[in-house]
Structures are given as C-alpha cells and as structure tokens.
Amino acid sequence: IDYAFLDRTLQATRDSGQKLAFRVMCCSTTRNHPYHPKWLKEIGGRELQTRYQGQGPLSVPDLDDPAVLEKHLDFIKRLGAKYDGHPDIEHVDLGSVGWWGEWHMSGSTGAKMPTPDTQKKIVDAYLDAFKKTPLLMLIGGGPMLKHAAEHGTGWRADCLGDMGGFSKTWCHMRMAYPKMLPEAGALDAWKTAPVAWETCWDMRKWVNEGWSLRFIFNYALALHGSY
C-alpha cells in the first residue's frame, strides 16, 4: 500500500476543508494501464485476458485465484488497520470487484465476475476492516448488497438523472433503482449509513432532454441521499 500517497491526499483534503471518500479498483478498462500491481504475476497470481466493449486486450486479476484473493484480503485488512476511523475520511466505497470496483463486468469478453463465495469473502473483509468508518456499496451488487446492507452499510447509485439517455425503453430512475433497492432490503439503510448519488451527465443535459429537474431532485431526496 502506498501510504504516502494516501496521506498526501488526506492532507490535501484536510487543507481544503473537506473529507475524502474513496474506492479500491482492481479491473481497469484502459489498455497498458492496469490497476493491479506488477508483482502479482511474479508471485504466481493469475491474470485474465479480456476485452471491454471490443477494446483490448486488457489484463485483470483473477480474484478467484487463491494467491490473488489472499493478497487482496490482506490488502483490505491492512488498509483498515491504518485508516479505519480516520477523521478525514467520510466513507469508504466497498469496491474491489468488477470494472472500476463497481460490481459488474458488463461488456467484458474473457473475464467474468468472481464466484459468490469470493465476493462474500471480499465484502466480509471490508466489514471486518472498517468498524468505525462508514461503508457504502454500489446498488448493482445484487445479493452482496443485501449481505452488506444487513451488516450496516449504506449504498451508492450511479446515473441519478437518467430518464432515458441510454435507451428509449429503459432508464435507471424508473426501472433500475426501484427494483434493486427493495430486492436488497436496502431502503432503510439511510437511517444508519450514508447514501450517495453519482449523476449521469449534468443539469444541462437534463434540461436539453426535457427531463424535470424538480422530479430528479425530489427523487434523490425521497431516497434520503446524503451526497
């Protein structure tokens, strides 16, 4: 772990009067810029070759490989030992798995999501490592979000504001969030943990598309968004 980098980032955050939220990412979609360390392969850790939306080849770690999983669980443990309860950290996004740590491998050819057993071990590692700093998890995590929420995490959702920007027949606001959150039993998570929204595009796009700003903002507030 590059503690010096994190400490510099926390210092800059503190100097600006803010707090830091961050997520660990293992799978990069940028060719020749992997997120995992070079030494992983040298110790016998297995890498997978894949493509993202036809682009690649891309090298990603196989979290189901015992050598890779052991190192990653140890990484999470040491991260928590150093930073759990740090006064300048607002929350930690429970990531690691999938593209950008967002719990999916959509558009991938050659790499799948880790097994449910591996996913649960990673979630449990975060739960064990961070007892003081709040955790939240992307709502696309499916059963893992349910498991995490049952143990006190909050949730984060991508694409607040999407009323049809990707498809004429599907959107996040009306079809994704109303299904994912009840299935995970996470609708009351806001009472004890953070809820974070990440927008798709910005208000200029929303206005240009004719989408109601009032509806979007009221939607975010109705689900008790913290950020």
Regions found by a protein language model. Name each.
Residues 1-53, 113-134:
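Aromatic-lined substrate-binding rim segments of carbohydrate-active enzymes
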Residues 48-112:
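Active-site groove signature of glycoside hydrolases
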Residues 43-44, 53-55, 79, 84, ...:
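Feature targets compositionally biased, intrinsically disordered low-complexity regions
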Residues 2-5, 64-75, 114-118, 208, ...:
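Soluble or luminal CAZymes and related metallo-dependent hydrolases
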Residues 8, 74, 81, 128, ...:
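Charged/polar, solvent-exposed surface patches and flexible loops
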Residues 14, 91-227:
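Catalytic-core regions of glycoside hydrolase
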